[in-house]
Amino acid sequence: MEATMDQTQPLNEKQVPNSEGCYVWQVSDMNRLRRFLCFGSEGGTYYIEEKKLGQENAEALLRLIEDGKGCEVVQEIKTFSQEGRAAKQEPTLFALAVCSQCSDIKTKQAAFRAVPEVCRIPTHLFTFIQFKKDLKEGMKCGMWGRALRKAVSDWYNTKDALNLAMAVTKYKQRNGWSHKDLLRLSHIKPANEGLTMVAKYVSKGWKEVQEAYKEKELSPETEKVLKYLEATERVKRTKDELEIIHLIDEYRLVREHLLTIHLKSKEIWKSLLQDMPLTALLRNLGKMTADSVLAPASSEVSSVCERLTNEKLLKKARIHPFHILVALETYKKGHGNRGKLRWIPDTSIVEALDNAFYKSFKLVEPTGKRFLLAIDVSASMNQRVLGSILNASVVAAAMCMLVARTEKDSHMVAFSDEMLPCPITVNMLLHEVVEKMSDITMGSTDCALPMLWAQKTNTAADIFIVFTDCETNVEDVHPATALKQYREKMGIPAKLIVCAMTSNGFSIADPDDRGMLDICGFDSGALDVIRNFTLDLI
């Protein structure tokens, strides 16, 4: 027997009655705030390109503060930052800046206390300060009051001295701000000997540090800080390749510590490679192959292949299959998306990336939701996705594989003359999925059809996702209407995501229905948005 419900009954506790007595998915100001923190917009559309943030983008945030919920807002900012829910970092930093200069004292204090937790690296701190400057424009009062000076001082003083030395030498400046600016403007009083040394180094330079500490007896911890700062200075002044390699190896210096001329040396790259994080390794494979650092059949290639296929390392680095797929397709092409760099792909590395891609599926945590993916199989899906080197058809195939391998109860269908089941199995390889999809006769991408088909076939789904290029047709029934009809008939509070991967902009999601989302383009941030939306976190 079919489950039927009418809109005068709630589908779950999150629905509320409207003025006509029908139950709807209300988008509360807290929901709008969460969307903003995740992807920089309070509406139902995620754009992959950067948008300039202003107070007009954060009206719900301002209303929540006015309603006396500012401390809850700050807690939400901390949660999104600490749990890695944000697809982009800027919105959380902007929201914190807004909270830090609102008129509500408690919100302000909570925001400043949160600065060390939300601004985890110097780049975040510089961005936060710049947002505060932007928000102060046109206002007569200055921004460097006691509260900001204390928050910035605390940011530095709560750090371990050696870790701070690493941070200030790696991330020197951003957005027009430097550590020297912040230390001067915050009137910092360093909390211990090691931090005093780092502050002197930033403010006065290495010669002053040498002079001040040459005859002082130092604690073992402060001695380490001195030696580390000396290493970062020596590496900038020497042309001796062996000395540079020794300094990299002994003090674990990174690429940012080196001069551009140093990066022309194969041996220096080999030294950097030893401790290079996996994400940086994926980014630099082309460069290192082009410069013969990764020469065919070399020990470096063997080491890279071993690391790429090590499940423990993949898990520790939280590498998503999509990140590996982008690296694989970029590397195979022998050139980047932009720039003049060219290389001949090493077959062993291609094979290792391919293995890593399939291994990484095991590391994705299932959501436990029932998915129905509807795929556009038209020839135009061979176009490049906005923000990626991948074609739309490859992204759609990879997402089908991801859902098939991680979610137990899932269905794949294709837009043909009618909705057709897409025969994708757990053990299929990527090229096999792409071939299966291309074998299906294409039809119009009517975004209402997946819900109408699921309703007709009595298919239970919590999440509908449409993957298309930029064809987002609305024909006899609007997708929002089809989704509401599906919810009503099946008694399931289903959600719809329309992902138009080559589109600059479209509008299908009802902005007042928190169960609908549009995605323009596709990038790694879109994965965070989809997951958060699926788990009801935004």
Curated annotation (Swiss-Prot):
TROVE domain mapped to chain residues: 16-369
GO function terms (MF aspect): metal ion binding; misfolded RNA binding; RNA binding
Region (VWFA-like domain) location: 361-538
Coiled coil start-end: none
Pfam families: TROVE, vWA_Ro60
PROSITE patterns: TROVE
Spans annotated as RNA-binding: 120-284
Keywords per UniProt: Cilium biogenesis/degradation, Cytoplasm, Metal-binding, Ribonucleoprotein, RNA-binding
InterPro entries, per database record: TROVE2, TROVE_dom, TROVE_dom_sf, vWA_Ro60, vWFA_dom_sf
Superkingdom to which the source organism belongs: Eukaryota
BP terms from Gene Ontology: cell projection organization
UniProt keyword Methyltransferase present: no
The record's note on its domains: The horseshoe-shaped TROVE domain is built with 7 helical HEAT-like repeats, and is closed by the VWFA-like domain giving rise to a ring-shaped monomer. Single-stranded RNA is bound in the positively charged central cavity.
Protein name: RNA-binding protein RO60
